[in-house]
Amino acid sequence: MSILLKGGLILYDTSYHPTRADILIEGDKIVEVKRNINKAADEVIDASHSLIIPAFINAHTHSPMVIFRGLAEDVPLMDWLQNYIWPAERKLKRKEVYWGAKLALLEMVHSGISTFVDMYFYMEEVARATLEVGLRGFLGYGMVDLEDEEKRRKEIKETEKLHEFITKLNSKLVKFILAPHAPYTCSLDCLKWVAEKSREWDSLVTIHLAETRDEIKIMEEKYGRSPVEVLKEANLLNDKLIAAHGIWLSKKDLEMLASSNVTIAHCPASNMKLGSGIFPMRDAIDEDINVALGTDGAASNNTLDIIREMRLASLLQKVNTLNPAIVKSEEIFRMATINGAKALKLKAGIIKEGYIADIAVINLKRSHLLPLHNPLATLIFSAKAGDIDTLIVSGRVIMLDGEVLTIDEEKVIDKFLGVGI
């Protein structure tokens, strides 16, 4: 299968210099980017009024939690979890997780997301939804043992079961990831088991880290050390680890994460909404930490719009430091694209020959996007999810002219109309 995108304005390579050109895709790869490509293709897409960008990578979310959008509002994280989310989750059935994931995946398609890192339960259902929609998912069972040996055995069994299930799928798009929930909800024995299996299975790991001051206090009381130091003791600090949030990190913590090549998945909307704190972005970047971007779940965001996430990530740092130059648009865009690809060991996240054909096309015929003096700044500060017109994932057109081609979107929407009040 070949696709030819004609005449688009492209944010090419990592310089993001706007270039008017064509893009030829063969199979799942970008094979040519230049003006006036005259080769035949199975599908030709007119992109003459479009901005063409690498598709986004959502480095931290909980897709089925879209079911709880708006359920718990104006409360801090621990209250949100213990009194609202965890009780509601205990009632969830497999079928509900499947439909919730499908709704979330549709929202991510319209946000221009090709790839997401997901932590939840009943992940076989999320895998099924992911394959049907056609996105790329790194799926992990969220392990929580709370120092209970019997529960730890159950969590290990569930994780092994998911690993076997995804391995047997042998899919290019659905990948396994180990997903211990957090250092304060997982015992040291559980974390050490995860580290061991990460090496044995050559698996990536995702975990919540230093999200709140309460977490820091819990870890100090329990271990006399920071959460980062506990992860080091568990042998989890390495380039396979994607740590979500990373708000309450000391200089020593940042240095340890940097020297271990850990990725931090920054989730500004969730952090702001739950009053968790502000990620020390400049300090992390200056330590040469790979910072990616995540939406977190729609229960705490309350959207999966990663364009809005880029905007919030930039604005939050500017106002917090009273410095409009504290972070550049190029740095923010990298977080949502190539930095996520680096964390996931994917040759993706940029538009360049030889890279995976994960591409989002933005319709520029929108009043809020014109005039176009600076395409990258316009994308971050003016665009929104609904501006994504076409999405290509691994060389396959998932959405064209705003219409999702892989599943019946109306059927999914109808499933949730009337749910709530």
UniProtKB/Swiss-Prot annotation:
Its cofactor is Zn(2+). The keyword Zinc applies. It is an enzyme of class 3 (hydrolase). It catalyses: S-adenosyl-L-homocysteine + H2O + H(+) = S-inosyl-L-homocysteine + NH4(+); S-methyl-5'-thioadenosine + H2O + H(+) = S-methyl-5'-thioinosine + NH4(+). CDD domains: ATZ_TRZ_like. Signal peptide: none annotated. GO terms for molecular function: 5'-methylthioadenosine deaminase activity; metal ion binding; S-adenosylhomocysteine deaminase activity. Its EC number is 3.5.4.28, 3.5.4.31. The keyword Metal-binding applies. Binds 1 zinc ion per subunit. Zn(2+) binds at H60, H62, H208, D296. It holds the Pfam family Amidohydro_1. Substrate binds at E89, H181, E211, D296. Disulfide bonds: none annotated. Keywords: Hydrolase, Metal-binding, Zinc. It comes from the Archaea. Catalyzes the deamination of 5-methylthioadenosine and S-adenosyl-L-homocysteine into 5-methylthioinosine and S-inosyl-L-homocysteine, respectively. Is also able to deaminate adenosine. Belongs to the metallo-dependent hydrolases superfamily. MTA/SAH deaminase family. This is 5-methylthioadenosine/S-adenosylhomocysteine deaminase. The lineage of its organism: Archaea, Methanobacteriati, Methanobacteriota, Thermococci, Thermococcales.
